[in-house]
Amino acid sequence: EATNARAARLRAKIASDTSLAAIQTKREQLPVREFKDAILNAVRANQVVLVAGSTGCGKTTQVPQYVLDDAWANGRGASIVCTQPRRISAMTVSERIANERGESIGQSTVGYQIRLESRVSADCSLLFCTSGVLLRRLTSEASDTLCESLTHIIIDELHERDLFADFLTIILK
């Protein structure tokens, strides 16, 4: 019920705000939009999905929102963690997505957590963090409850391999 209410509030906000409607129009024009249904079908049917596309096609900003909105549309809650290779990326991508959704970072469904800084609300459904932050969370004593609460883990920019991302993929395997 709460999930449907959140989705309805977002739709109403977009419908009543011309600047948000303009942002939604631009989102619809991104190249990744053409593959939205295929991506969501793959996510629903598989435990692991690899999404590849050219730089700027919208993978980073749109795929997490597609997954979140799909969960809400189907009456399911979502707890999505999306890793970024750098702290600045985790911060800027989360701010961009919050802006696209007409929300304030850390006071909405979108937040970020980096080393020594966290902007996350109790309603956060889409958390951006570095690979290192997620790795530490998964290897902590509370990792069992964390794993049970997460619905999706998105590792962005995996081709930019580093030690944290390599260990993260091993642990998730």
What are these regions (language model features)?
Residues A12-K173:
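Conserved P-loop NTPase motor core
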Residues E1-A15:
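Interdomain "pre-motor" coupling segment immediately N-terminal to P-loop NTPase/helicase cores
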